[in-house]
UniProtKB/Swiss-Prot annotation:
Covalently attached lipid (S-diacylglycerol cysteine), positions: 18
InterPro entries, alphabetized: LolA/LolB/LppX, OM_lipoprot_LolB
Annotated localization: Cell outer membrane
Stated name of the protein: Outer-membrane lipoprotein LolB
Domain of life: Bacteria
Gene: lolB
Assembly with partners or alone: Monomer.
GO process terms (BP): lipoprotein localization to outer membrane; protein transport
C-alpha cells in the first residue's frame, strides 16, 4: 500500500504558485472581505517554503500516517515522505512537465505531471494542482470556490471541486499567518496535514 499512499499525497506537488488572483469565489463568514483580499495578496507572493510535519491518509480499504518534508523553490519541488505511512521512504521531485517519484525498494516512476501519476497508478482523478494553494490557506484561482472566513479574516473552510478543506489552526511565521492543521475531505479519501515547522520565503518575481 506504500505506493498508493505516496501517490495519493503526490498531488501536493503540482506547481501553480505563479498564477494570478482571479479566483471565482463566494465569500461568507465572520471575516472582513477587504482584509481577506489583503491577506490573500500577501500569501500569494510566497514562491518558496520549507515544511516539516506529519500527514495522515484515510481511504476505504487502507490508512496510514507518516512524516512530511516539502521544499518549494518557485517551479521546483522536493517532497519526501517517511515513516509508517509507507513502511519506508519516498521522494517526489520535479518541475512543470517532469515529475519523478522514487519509492524505497520499489523503484522510480516518471510522468509529466502528478495528475498523470495518479491516473496511471490508481485511476483516480483529483484536483492535484490545488494543494499548493490550499497549503498556504488560499483557494486555487482557476475554479469556483466557496470560502468561509474566520474572525481574523483567514480561511476557516473552503469548498472547491468536490473537496472540503477545514483550517483548524494557524501559526505566525516571519509576518505570515499560515495553516498549521488542515483537514481535507474528498470522495472516499481524507487527508490530514499537521505542519510543525513553516519556513516561508519570497524568492522574487
Amino acid at each position: 500500500m506504500f505506493l498508493r499512499h505516496v501517490i495519493v499525497f503526490s498531488f501536493i506537488a503540482l506547481l501553480a504558485g505563479c498564477a494570478g488572483l482571479t479566483s471565482r469565489e463566494a465569500v461568507q463568514g465572520k471575516g472582513d472581505p477587504a482584509q481577506w483580499r489583503e491577506h490573500k495578496q500577501q500569501l500569494s507572493s510566497l514562491d518558496g517554503w520549507q515544511i516539516n510535519g506529519k500527514v495522515g491518509i484515510r481511504a476505504p480499504k487502507d490508512s496510514g500516517s507518516g512524516t512530511l518534508f516539502w521544499l518549494q523553490r518557485q517551479d521546483y519541488y522536493d517532497i519526501r515522505l517517511s515513516g509508517p505511512l509507507g513502511r519506508g521512504a519516498a521522494r517526489l521531485t520535479g518541475r512543470p512537465g517532469a515529475v519523478a517519484l522514487e519509492v524505497a525498494n520499489q523503484g522510480r516512476y516518471e510522468a509529466p505531471t502528478p495528475e498523470t501519476l495518479l491516473q496511471d497508478q490508481l485511476g483516480w482523478k483529483l484536483p492535484v494542482s490545488h494543494l499548493v494553494w490550499w497549503v498556504r490557506g488560499l483557494p486555487a484561482p482557476d475554479s469556483k470556490s466557496n470560502v468561509t472566513l474566520d474572525g481574523d479574516s483567514r480561511l476557516a473552510s473552503l469548498e472547491q471541486d468536490g473537496w472540503q478543506v477545514e483550517y483548524l489552526s494557524y501559526v505566525e511565521q516571519n509576518g505570515y499567518w499560515l495553516p498549521e492543521r488542515v483537514k481535507l475531505h474528498g470522495q472516499d479519501l481524507d487527508v490530514t496535514l499537521v505542519i510543525k515547522d513553516w519556513q516561508p520565503r519570497k524568492l522574487g518575481q
